[in-house]
Amino acid sequence: MEKGTTVITGANMAGKTVLLKSVQLAQYLMQFGFYVPARRAGMPLVEQVLTSIGDDQDELNGLSSYAAEMLRVDEMIRQVRQRSKILVLIDELARTTNPVEGRAIVNGVVDFLTTHRVMAMVTTHYSGITAECRKLRVRGFVENRVEGNMTLKNINEFIDYSLEEDSGEEVPQEAMRIAWMLGIDRGVLERVENYLQEENPDWKKTVQ
């Protein structure tokens, strides 16, 4: 871990959320003097670990998932303005709003975190993240395992969870591949792929 903001992309079910939770756990273990689950680790001490992981929707108080997330991120921003020794972990920022504004929100927050030189990791499924940051990508599906029936019990056989540097702005588009491998209704998936091809003629069908 080092100062600066890292944006992590990857396919659905590729372990991005688990990665953030693992980093959070490792940071706490290290600061309390315990071994961390790694062959080696370099982790500076921080005054606070701030996380936005999960859904804080509150129907009783009229908070949507998006509103709850924005309030939580706003509190993080206030904390970052006050101190620099902070670890910020944000999972799928702005995932519950439309892609255009969601992408802009990710860029704005990442730009803010980079400017304030805090340690931060932000996961996203949005393409077009142009704010200055380090970019990593979960490798995702093992290419020679594109066929077969994937279940929650054997998913680890299909996905490579390791990280690699990623200089591009596009994120993996593997939602349809996951749906096919999970055995979702073929008729519905074919309709979905027809719409995808209408929107993007260069888009290739998952199953030819």
Spans of model-derived segments:
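ATPase nucleotide-binding head domains, primarily ABC-like/P-loop NTPase cores
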Residues: 1-208
